[in-house]
Swiss-Prot record:
HAMAP family: Rib_5P_isom_A. It comes from Bordetella petrii (strain ATCC BAA-461 / DSM 12804 / CCUG 43448). The gene is rpiA. The keyword Isomerase applies. The keyword rRNA-binding does not apply. One of its GO terms (cellular component) is cytosol. It comes from the Bacteria. The lineage of its organism: Bacteria, Pseudomonadati, Pseudomonadota, Betaproteobacteria, Burkholderiales. This is Ribose-5-phosphate isomerase A. Gene3D superfamilies: 3.30.70.260, 3.40.50.1360.
Length: 225
């Protein structure tokens, strides 16, 4: 039986195979953050001379890319990217996701918004019938912490400050358990509209375009309905 680490590697390798035909001297790839994205970055190193560069969704990923000699570009200097590749903490059959376990969801959303396609790479443990078992990360401007926490309680959540953590943007994370996520796009809009919220970890407006799900029987490919 494959370990979770081996499944993550399988998903990363599948993404590399999927993007290889797209590579070229003018191509820029968007790269996410997390343990599975790290494996994708490690594999991307062998293609570093076949693309113009990358845009990273976190300082962590930027450092890992640079460590492999892969060019990291500022998103402000990039007008288009064919793909953004990232993992997820949870994903459902509609390819809606919860992300932000690493606290990078704001930059992940920004980079993903510029890409033509979002490829999500996950192992089979991340596929769920309904989102919400994984607490929803919400990036919040520090002065709004209590006000946002009260609003999240009113929505049925149980927010907890992620102690000792500051985002790359200088903000805090509230991890919100107990939310009833029946309509992920609607909840994403509601939470993101709370004053003081930078963005939440729901990725449903839109979700991923393709999910490469690593299973004990190989890669299962899911497309957005």
């Amino acid at each position: 039986m494959l370990t979770q680490q081996e499944l993550k590697q399988q998903a990363a390798d599948a993404a590399l195979a999927l993007i290889e035909p797209l590579l070229g001297p003018d191509v820029i790839i968007g790269v996410g953050t997390g343990s599975t994205a790290d494996l994708f970055i490690d594999g991307l190193a062998r293609y570093r001379d076949r693309l113009r560069g990358t845009v990273a969704s976190s300082e962590r990923s930027a450092a890992r890319l640079a460590g492999h000699g892969i060019t990291v570009l500022d998103l402000n200097d990039v007008t288009s990217m064919p793909v953004y590749v990232d993992g997820a903490d949870e994903i459902d059959a509609r390819l809606h996701m919860i992300k932000g376990g690493g606290g990078a969801q704001t930059r992940e959303k920004i980079v993903a918004s510029v890409a033509d396609r979002y490829i999500c790479i996950v192992d089979e443990s991340k596929l769920v019938e309904r989102l919400g078992s994984f607490p929803l990360p919400v990036e919040v401007i520090p002065m709004a912490r209590q006000a946002v926490a009260r609003a999240l309680v009113a929505l049925g959540g149980q927010p907890r400050l992620r102690e000792g953590f500051t985002t790359d943007n200088g903000n805090i994370i509230l991890d919100v358990a107990g939310l009833q996520i029946d309509d992920a796009p609607a909840l994403e809009l509601t939470v993101n509209n709370l004053p003081g919220v930078v963005t939440c970890g729901l990725f449903a407006r839109p979700g991923a375009d393709v999910a490469l799900l690593a299973t004990q029987n190989g890669i299962r490919r899911l497309e957005r309905p």
